[in-house]
Amino acid sequence: MNIYTVNYILSRLSFAMAAALAIPLVLAIVGKEASREAFMLSVFVSIFFGIAFRRYGSPSDDLTPREGIAITAFGWFTGTFLGMLPYLLGHYLGFLDALFESISGFTGTGATVFVTLDGVPYSILFWRMMTAWIGGLGIIVIFIALLPQSGASTIYMYSAEGSGPTLDRVMPRLHEMTVALFKIYLIFTVITTAIFMVCGVDFSIALAHAMSTIGTCGFSTYDDSTMHFHNLPFELWTALFMFLAGGSFSLYYRAYIKGPTVILRNAEFRTYLGIVLAATLLIALNLILSMGMDGSMAARVAIFQVTSLSTTGFVSADFETWPTFSKMVLLLLMVIGGCAGSTASGIKVARLILLVRNARAVVLQKLNPNRVVDITLTGAHVDGAMLLRVGTFFFLYLAVIFVTAFLLAMDGLLPFDAVAVAITTIGNIGPAFGIVSATSTYAPLSDFSKAILCLTMLLGRLEIFTLLILLQPSFWRRTHRW
């Protein structure tokens, strides 16, 4: 592995983090907040990292998948470490809690260890939202978009940070495609901010929640999340943009080029829409029949929590008090997540479709061994290699949930709570049930559990394979050529 090239890219990433940290620094200085010293030190540390990496780095165009994977993995390690510095240096959180909050933000999980946000400076709250926004599209994807040129490494970096199976052939024009996705991401953020302001929310709060919404994180500037606003238009628009953020941004780009009918012809998006509508109807009916909830209120909280817990993690109602059936539907949505190419995590709707179609193909071939079943996704043939990757990912996803839940239960969590927390952290959702319900935080968990969940959140965001590759001895051998 060419460690010098990896260091060179990490140096540029560190300088980019310094530039990002400078934004809340300006807010802290203008607002005369006590956090300005913490942000100033964070900027200096980021610059120091950039200089240190640059000292032992050099650019190169001769890169392999191994360098791309290393850059992605260590890029996330570096980004989350530098991102935790304002919390740590400002004495708002201890080391592990600061790291947890940073990873939670960048991975779009939205799980917080702040006991309360009252008294926390706006610059710190804004930085939490920035981590959600940067990590939503992807630290590496945004970094690629801001690079003045593209090369072989960008393809490997993009693949390593990928967000689900896709049949789009974007690699030959990867840099152009990434810039386009970044522009769409910006446009969505601006539109969301403007609409939130029309709903009566102040600009600073509207911008913060827009970044968290489009980044599908769920961080809020208030302890009671979106329940704080008691604003129906705000909730409905938030639900709409959470739903859109759970869709494929590359699909939106194609719709811009070829027309909106592309979206409706996409099998994954249609399935995603169907899942959201079906889950909303089931939960609303369950709330009406089991709790006697008013129909309009049941529909309101159902549509919000369905779109939220399949992507983001905002809270508009205490779903801990809901019937078991509704909780199980929400838990299933956490597992599924959003679409491939979205800012949401989970197993992705595309994988769910392929798993179901592959199972159907196996059943048909059992009935007729000579039958050849062609598996497609939106009209494109899916080969055996991709089906194998999808099946392997699904197995590993369930394995991570099982291991995480086992370790949490060993640390004292109730079995159902442990499973729910494992699902919500690997799915990068945030709120779960029990000890970390809609109205709770992750602060009561032990350091052991928090450390486990830090790793689980990263595994979920990087889709397991990238981090598992680091455990392969051949990855670190100088003589091994990938």
Residue ranges with predicted function:
Residues 1-482:
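Membrane-proximal intracellular helices of multi-pass ion channels
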